Amino acid sequence: MPSRSRSAVTCGSAVTALRERLGMSCHLCVPSHLFALCLVHDEGNGCGPCRPHLRELVPCHCTAAGKALLAWREGWREAVLEQPLASFTERTNTGPESLRRELARTVARGYSVEDREYEGDTRGLAAPVFGETGEAMAAMAVVAPVERLQADRYSDIGATVMAAAASLSAELGHTPAVAA
């Protein structure tokens, strides 16, 4: 397993590489109690400041990184969904059952989608980063204003985010299970 300082450098480099490839704000979040904590943030070109900011705790049910963590961390997901879920915009999904259905679609797709649910003018996509134990330990995300991250580009951008997250997972010691 890489040392903690080496892991931090590896994560920072991976987020920067994704930002350079996409030209949009990218970040990496980890679970922190019932929230997602932004550990790495790299601002995109001409995007303006997009949340989450470095060291900011954000809700999981309405952010791309938070949804990716919820989708792949079942026990933690249930702890989060048992709590009251705040509404931040008219698009925020606060229903635990509808969120469970959305998270099942997230797992099937391979990345989460946040469409103006936390801030009314941004969208985000995120994919899980797995550790050597196979648990989703973080989520790598891209967030941008709606005019920069258009819904018809989700598939292409989502694939790029998933590839970056898979590469980071491998660097952190994750070996995907091989189907028999």
Task: List PLM regions with ranges.
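Amphipathic alpha-helical effector-binding/dimerization core
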Residues: M1-Q83
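N-terminal helix-turn-helix
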Residues: M1-V9, A159, A166-H174
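Flexible, glycine/proline-enriched loop segments at strand-loop-helix junctions
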Residues: P2, T89-R91
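Solvent-exposed, charged/polar functional surfaces in cytosolic regulatory/catalytic domains
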Residues: A17, R21, R101-R105, S167, ...
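Generic structural signal for secondary-structure transition and capping sites
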Residues: G23, E74, L85, A108-S112, ...
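Cysteine/selenocysteine-centered motifs that mediate thiol-based redox chemistry or coordinate metal-sulfur cofactors
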Residues: A79-S87, M162-A180
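Extended hydrophobic
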Residues: T92-A165
